[in-house]
Amino acid sequence: MHYHTNLIAALLLAALIHEGSAIWCYRCTSATPGCAEKFNWRGIGFLGEHCPEPDDICVKVTERRGARETITRDCLSALSFRKDIPADKYEGCRPAAHDEKLANYVNHTIKEHDVRRDYYTDTTFCFCFLDHRCNGASGLQTSAVIGLLTLIPALLLR
């Protein structure tokens, strides 16, 4: 009898525990104080935000042209509009992908719109999802707590 009670409690707990909640990432640009190359989380004034997707990745995009440098820190899902994201998104840094057909059929004369994404001469994407200093899942969702609370009476009735 105890075996069945423990089995039911374990199955209930497994059903109620969801994936870890969304990853936390810093979301800022180098125009924000503290978000440049020398990062200072106290300067940006917050500890990051939840990414909207459950399997998201934190990204740091560094774009350079001459002495000018722009750094963007965000979730990968928020940058999904970009066409130069490298195919390999595993932990680490790599150069931006180059799309030969990007804006090939566009008759566009306003260079500030940068439809060809060629304003910056050097673009690097750094992906981060394993390093706890970069981000961290906030643990189990509240349904896991509810599952544990329902498991405790089952174990106490033994």
From Swiss-Prot:
Q: List the keywords (alphabetical).
A: Biological rhythms, Glycoprotein, GPI-anchor, Lipoprotein, Membrane, Signal, Transmembrane, Transmembrane helix
Mapped to this chain, the residue ranges on the Cytoplasmic side of the membrane are: 158
- Bilayer topology term: Lipid-anchor; GPI-anchor
Describe what happens without this gene. Conditional RNAi mediated knock-down in tracheal cells leads to aberrant tracheal dorsal trunk development resulting in tracheal tube size defects. Conditional RNAi knock-down in tracheal cells compromises epithelial paracellular barrier function in trachea due to reduced and irregular septate junction formation.
Proregion residues excised on maturation: 136-158
The record's GO CC annotations read:
septate junction; side of membrane
Query: What Pfam family is a match for this entry?
Result: QVR
Q: Which CDD domains match?
A: TFP_LU_ECD_Crim
Location (main, coarse): membrane
Q: Where does the sequence pass through the membrane?
A: 137-157
Signal peptide interval = 1-22
Cellular localization per UniProt:
Membrane
Glycosylation (residues): 107
Q: Which family does it belong to?
A: Belongs to the quiver family.
The job of this chain, per UniProt, is described as: Required for septate junction assembly possibly by organizing the preassembly and transport of septate junction proteins. Involved in epithelial cell septate junction-mediated paracellular barrier functions of trachea, hindgut and salivary gland.
Output this protein's name: UPAR/Ly6 domain-containing protein crim
In its UniProt entry, the species of origin is given as Drosophila melanogaster (Fruit fly)
Q: What is the lineage of its organism?
A: Eukaryota, Metazoa, Ecdysozoa, Arthropoda, Hexapoda
As recorded in Swiss-Prot or TrEMBL, the protein's gene is named crim
